[in-house]
């Protein structure tokens, strides 16, 4: 899997201690729609892309007694959908682990219907939807247990 980084123990992006995977690509849809640079994660574009074996990454997660969920964010996980799906399949079917997997996406539900159909095949998948909109109010998301940056953003347990 290609990533821009990972955080072994993250306590900011989900209510449970998580391993945070920083996915490497994004179409910069927030910038395009706002006709200016608004991306909160644009600094990640300067980070080198690293390649890590899925099994190695999974074993790293399972060896940590603190974390109990995996959060996929960074730039845009759904712009690396094959890698994301392969990793989820490994966690669910090879390792037989049903810990929560949270996916932060800037896409709307309507834009990713096909991908959601694939993700719904796995248990305990939570998706945060919606692009960042500057000058919007933050709000607390009950499912994630943390604040989201724009009032159009929300999460949903899809399976």
PLM feature spans:
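Canonical radical SAM enzyme core domain
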Residues: 43-58, 78-121
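Conserved glycine-rich "GG(E/T)P / GGGxP" loop and the immediately following alpha-helix
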Residues: 66-91, 133, 137-148
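Conserved acidic residues
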Residues: 68, 124-125
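Flexible, charged surface loops at secondary-structure boundaries
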Residues: 14-15, 62-66, 121
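Canonical Radical SAM [4Fe-4S] cluster-binding loop centered on the CxxxCxxC motif
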Residues: 11-52
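N-terminal amphipathic/basic leader segments beginning at the initiator methionine
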Residues: 1-11
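Classical nucleotidyltransferase
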Residues: 113, 119, 125-159
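A cross-family glycoside hydrolase active-site/sugar-binding cleft signature
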Residues: 22, 73, 102-106, 130
